[in-house]
Regions:
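Flexible helix-coil linker/hinge segments at domain or subdomain boundaries
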Residues: 152, 250-254, 377-385, 639
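Bacterial peptidoglycan biogenesis and beta-lactam-recognition machinery
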Residues: 85-90, 151, 233-235, 245-251, ...
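Short, structured secondary-structure elements
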Residues: 116-121, 158-165
Length: 685
């Protein structure tokens, strides 16, 4: 596609608004992926990728998930996923896992599957491709997963207990509350009853033939995609797909995959829940709106929407983070972004999320709403938008620089989403060109106009979910109180946000340069060792792991084991405190603003026996990296606001540690291994 055509469409979009979206050109599809469809409807994606060499990833994506279950089938999609590993036409019993492990594929790490609301995906990765017979056997596994899962009675019976165990591990704390809340959040509609884990009563009681009927109904080639990416012969793979899959028939009068719509809510919905295992008081405010239909996602307007969502989320998150540093801020952290409403694909929502300080849930709810309302009324500033653009383009440049070092899973994930929901798949080069034309020409006025639309001003499609710690002394908000807060915030007279930016260099005066006193070259291992005039030793090594990336580490052989017991906790958290501090004349918040768009960062490290720094940058930003290293070593400055915020966050989590199963388990193991020593246990709040 001609870039001039894209640019003309962008100008049209900016001048005429979103009504012109449908007239914009299509997003180009990456020409390096071979996409085809067999006569029976099966779709395939094949891409040669030699990073890393001699391995490939094999996927089969099913355009079916828990939303396709009937009321008496809740959990069958998930149970069926488990049974794909317990016997197929060509791999009886556990021989599928045994075979893959024999060629180096490990179950859990390289071999797995997942069931979602609207898709089920099976995969195995890092398969050696030097033997054509191994590749062909892997193709046969995909064929069996398509229409050859055995579903024997013995396998079904044994897998019921496995699903029970998974349910016990997953449905804890916050997950429990979400599952309880979904029916009300979806006003009794189907999405409210289709959490993928399902009902254990269905898992226990379903007859084998019921599961087989579900399998035959939905696991069909017209609902499936074969995705293979790696160091393979594309033509051989395509021929093998045609050979293995062309003969699979689609039943007459096959059931259609139909989108399930989500109704608007005329009045606000408020759900308040509590759980003993919940670690923090958390709330989410959803402002619902229609999702972009799959049919329009290949349109350039969808790409523009994604960019606007990205920068809006970035800018409002920065405001929330800055506000959280104030001593009287009632929340610990907050963010916002536009995306799917809970688990549905047909309804989106601009979602505000906040974690309240203990006892401050209502105040935090108001504060998070207030900042969103401020965006609605005044929008963002030019300096905020410039930082967001710089950060966005920095990521674009990074992706372009590493386009030849993309791993297989970066592609397979894209192709799964393209098949199941028509997400665009342009090449990195084409997308980079688009952004380099679009971003400089998309004005702040358009961003602010779009942001204004996202923050709703009526109770229609407003939904709030509050999930709190269950404690004897806790006071929980009521629906009436939350509704009153919404009305109050909307009626407040707010002032526009003022973006205070420090217009100074990171280092006011460059330090006096030292000298290289000695250079030793190790040709065998390919590095140079420099000895500087201050005694520091520097090892330089050129690598080709990633293009356009520089990594850095500095280490000294003294760690927190040298500190006394009274300083142990201070030493344990020292690296976190130092990283949250300011540098030179910059507070941590001012530093974040100054580094926007830079691919450079340095952090402290502290272990029992070592301390040091680690970081990374690009060649373009290596000067910034060096400045940060120098400041981390010489000019860490106290930032009381940042320290207090971090301390409050840690205290909130640790105060409820006795109700956190994973922390209790960790504490018990550490206490046993180290004979009850407090130095090894989870800290007290």
């Amino acid at each position: 596609m001609k870039l001039r055509k894209i640019f003309a469409a962008v100008v049209l979009f900016l001048s005429a608004g979103t009504a012109m979206a449908q007239q914009m050109p299509a997003i180009p599809v990456d020409k390096n992926v071979k996409i085809g469809r067999l006569d029976n409807g099966l779709t395939y994606y094949i891409r040669h990728n030699s990073y890393p060499e001699h391995v490939a990833s094999f996927y089969i994506a099913q355009k079916v998930g828990s939303i396709n279950e009937n009321d008496d089938q809740r959990g069958l999609a998930h149970l069926l996923e488990h049974l794909a590993f317990n016997g197929t036409d060509h791999f009886k019993g556990n021989s599928l896992q045994d075979y893959l492990q024999s060629i180096g594929v490990q179950y859990g790490r390289n071999l797995n599957a997942y069931t979602a609301v609207e898709k089920t995906v099976y995969y195995f990765t890092d398969v050696p491709t030097t033997r054509t017979t191994a590749v062909d056997s892997c193709m046969l596994i995909l064929k069996d997963w398509s229409n050859g899962i055995s579903l024997t009675e013995d396998a079904i019976e044994s897998e019921r207990d496995v699903v029970h165990n998974e349910y016990r591990m997953r449905i804890v704390g916050q997950q429990r509350m979400i599952e309880r809340s979904l029916p009300k959040l979806y006003q009794g509609e189907k999405y409210g009853y289709r959490f993928p884990i399902g009902l254990m009563s269905v898992i226990d009681g379903c007859k084998p033939e019921t599961l087989r009927a579900y399998y035959r109904k939905w696991y069909r080639p017209d609902n499936q995609a074969i995705i293979i990416v790696g160091d393979v012969d594309v033509n051989h793979i395509e021929a093998k797909i045609k050979e293995l899959f062309s003969g699979i028939k689609v039943p007459k009068n096959a059931a259609k995959i139909e989108k399930v719509e989500v109704s608007d809510n005329d009045s606000a919905i408020y759900v308040i829940d509590k759980d003993k295992e919940q670690q923090v008081d958390l709330f989410q405010v959803y402002m619902k709106h229609n999702a972009v239909p799959d049919s329009l996602k290949s349109n350039m307007s969808y790409l523009l929407k994604g960019y606007m969502d990205n920068v809006i989320s970035s800018m409002i998150a920065a405001r929330y983070a800055e506000k959280a540093l104030e001593p009287d801020c009632p929340y610990l952290q907050a963010n916002a972004g536009d995306g799917s409403y809970l688990i549905s694909s047909t309804k989106d929502a601009f979602t505000l999320t906040g974690v309240a300080k203990p006892g401050k849930i209502k105040e935090a709810y108001a504060a998070v709403l207030r900042e969103a309302q401020r965006v609605h009324e005044f929008g963002f500033t030019a300096t905020e938008y410039q930082r967001a653009k710089d950060e966005f383009m920095s990521q674009v440049d990074k992706a372009l620089a590493n386009k030849d070092k993309m791993k297989n899973e970066q592609f397979t994930t894209q192709y799964v989403d393209n098949f199941t929901s028509n997400e665009p798949i342009p090449s990195v080069e084409e997308e980079s060109q688009i952004w380099k034309m679009v971003v400089p020409n998309l004005p702040l006025e358009v961003i602010n106009s779009y942001a204004k639309q996202l923050v709703c001003q009526s109770d229609t499609n407003l939904v709030s979910l509050v999930m709190m710690r269950e404690q004897p002394e806790a006071v929980y908000p009521t629906e009436q109180e939350l509704s009153a807060i919404v009305k109050q915030v909307r009626a407040e007279k707010l002032e526009a946000y003022v973006d205070n930016v420090k217009q100074e260099p990171l280092i006011a005066q460059a330090p006096k340069a030292g000298k290289i006193k000695k250079t030793v070259e190790n040709k065998k291992l390919g590095f140079k060792e420099l000895t500087l005039s201050n005694g520091a030793k520097v090892v330089l090594k050129k690598t080709d792991f990633k293009d356009n990336e520089i990594t850095f580490a500095a280490s000294a052989n003294v760690g927190y084991s040298t500190f006394g017991k009274e300083d142990f906790l201070n030493a344990t958290f020292a690296a976190d405190v130092l990283d949250a501090s300011g540098l030179g004349d910059f507070s941590s918040n001012e530093l974040d603003k100054a580094l926007a768009g830079k691919q450079a960062g340095v952090s402290f490290s502290l272990s029992p026996f070592n301390h040091g720094l680690k970081g990374n940058s690009t060649p373009k930003d290596i000067e910034t990296l060096m400045q940060l290293i120098y400041l981390k070593m010489t000019a860490v400055s106290k930032d009381q606001k940042s320290f207090d915020n971090m301390k409050s966050m840690m205290a909130t989590v640790l105060a409820n540690k006795s109700n956190n199963p994973s922390l209790v388990y960790q504490d018990s193991v550490q206490s046993t291994l180290y004979l009850g020593s407090k130095l090894a246990r989870v800290p007290e709040a």
